[in-house]
């Protein structure tokens, strides 16, 4: 994959629950703590190294932000770091929360 792909929250939910991809949330710590997808890895500048050690480059990665805009830059960055398959989630956490209100966790 030379370019990241934009996917819907429904596609992301399906990939996540099939174990086909990992989910990273790039929002600020306060927003993440107030609500995030339960399986999301909170990806920040400080946690990037740990993420890259934990997940091989052949791991498919889905990037979630607030509304689906910032995730595009982060998805491109992960591709440049060597990840083979990267997806940006359209609508971000706002869409996730709207579609899957029961699938939201709180805390860091």
UniProtKB/Swiss-Prot annotation:
Alphabetized SUPFAM superfamilies for the sequence: Rhodanese/Cell cycle control phosphatase
Pfam family, one: Rhodanese
Principal subcellular localization: cytoplasm
Cellular location(s): Cytoplasm
Assigned keywords, A-Z: Cytoplasm, Transferase
A GO term, aspect molecular function: thiosulfate-cyanide sulfurtransferase activity
GO biological process per UniProt: glycerol metabolic process
Active site: 65
Catalyzed reactions: thiosulfate + hydrogen cyanide = thiocyanate + sulfite + 2 H(+); thiosulfate + [thioredoxin]-dithiol = [thioredoxin]-disulfide + hydrogen sulfide + sulfite + 2 H(+)
Keyword Transferase: yes
Domain Rhodanese stretches: 17-105
NCBIfam families, per database record: PRK00162.1 (NF001195)
Family: Belongs to the GlpE family.
Functional description taken from the UniProt entry: Transferase that catalyzes the transfer of sulfur from thiosulfate to thiophilic acceptors such as cyanide or dithiols. May function in a CysM-independent thiosulfate assimilation pathway by catalyzing the conversion of thiosulfate to sulfite, which can then be used for L-cysteine biosynthesis.
Protein name: Thiosulfate sulfurtransferase GlpE
Species assigned in the record: Salmonella arizonae (strain ATCC BAA-731 / CDC346-86 / RSK2980)
Gene name of the record: glpE
């Amino acid at each position: 994959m030379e370019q990241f792909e934009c996917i819907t929250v429904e596609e992301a939910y399906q990939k996540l629950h099939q174990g086909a991809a990992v989910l990273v949330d790039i929002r600020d710590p306060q927003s993440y703590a107030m609500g995030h997808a339960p399986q999301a890895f909170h990806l920040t500048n400080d946690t990037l190294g740990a993420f890259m050690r934990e997940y091989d480059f052949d791991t498919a990665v889905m990037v979630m932000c607030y509304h689906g805009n910032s995730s595009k830059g982060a998805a491109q960055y992960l591709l440049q770091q060597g990840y083979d398959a990267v997806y940006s989630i359209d609508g971000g956490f706002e869409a996730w929360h709207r579609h899957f209100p029961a699938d939201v966790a709180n805390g860091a």
